[in-house]
Amino acid sequence: MYLSVTRMHSVVLLLCCSLFAAAPAIADEAELKSQIDTLRSQLNLLAEQQKSLAAQAAKAESDTSIGGYGEISYNNYRNDSSRNQADLKRFVLFVGHRFNDQLSFNSELEWEHAVASAEDKGETEVEQMYLNYQFANEMNLKTGLFLMPFGFLNQSHEPPVFYGVERNEVETRIIPSTWREGGIGLSGSSEKGMAWEAGIVTGFDSAKLDDASSPLAGSHQELQLARAHDLAFYGALNYRGTPGLTVGGALFSGNSTQGNADYRADTGKPDFSGINGRITLWELHTRWQKNDLDLQALYAKGKVSDADKMDNVLLNFNNTSTTARPYLPSEFYGWLLQAAYTVWRQGDMSVTPFMRIETFNTQSVMPAGFGADPANADHVSTLGLSFKPHPQVVYKADLQRYRDNPDNDRFNLGLGYMF
């Protein structure tokens, strides 16, 4: 702690009074002058210490950063108004700290659907928490819970960053955004515009698959008491050497039965002993941004080895259990094309209409004897508009049409922010 300015003035006054009180007893004028010089030196030293401590406190404060984002949505269904809903979809806070020029900490805390309780559907979760060590100018080591480098949305999903009130179907159903795993990862870049990431992380747990409409959503473990018998590896590569252009892809692969850990812990669950159930997911993407034009394309595909063996286990399980489990697909895929153009700008404000078409099928190939649900495949068209009164604040509106499942047709409104 350092002395406040008021306290320092009090010290000065006290010392001066003491000096003047003692003056009659000081016979030698030279001695008096020496004491005054000593006092002046001490005061100067005290002032310098105060400045130094204040500077250190200011630096320490700037090393810690806080940010966040949030979004609210309204969905109005064309054929069934009873499904209409308004939702405080997400409230997120970022907290980061830089320990020194090489070592930093990053975290992301998220609240979904406003209220989290036993009776409500809201969730509270740690979306990211990791340490990053920069041991070379263009190379980093990441350890902890972090986002997988897949597609456009998974690492950059703040509302002002993407088009549309809802996140696109392909990067929700095929790529399970927001997808994070615990582990260790390396990343680097070159002066020619190449950027790469690779690492070893926790994998999927196929015993937790609970939704055939999004095969990987329930089975990625989020580092919540994650089974770690079967780890996975990932890699991503992106080229950004041409201004405005991004071309890249990513791969993730690992066994998913986790040594049959779920059955070993509870024999009331499916028994996948002797089955590996490797899940492999890959994607390719490209983006071109030039002046007011923004074009995007993405293709993603997943494969589950041993899906036939696992589904036969699930068939026997479902025949004897009161709780039916969905069957795993051998393959699933999705693709999207998107175009946006900013038609008006004034100061910080802008208006950008966009159009997106996408196709997905979460059960494109099923093992022999197991049928696919038509509700899990569709062609979706989205036409919408984003108005930004500030680059970090957005109001959105769009129309969505589902060709094969028209009951999902809807009109959406939304707002979002980031800081």
Regions found by a protein language model. Give the residues of each.
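N-terminal secretory signal peptides that target proteins for export/translocation
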Residues: 1-8
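Bacterial N-terminal signal peptides
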Residues: 10-21
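N-terminal periplasmic/intermembrane-space "pro-region" immediately following the signal or transit peptide
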Residues: 25-77, 419
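A short secondary-structure junction signal
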Residues: 49, 197-199, 207-212, 260-261
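Outer membrane beta-barrel
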Residues: 57-206, 229-246, 329, 336-342, ...
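Outer-membrane beta-barrel pore domains
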Residues: 78-81, 117-118, 129-134, 154, ...
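Short, contiguous, pocket-lining structural segments
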Residues: 178, 222-229, 274-278, 285
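Loop-centered beta-sheet repeat module
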Residues: 208, 214-260
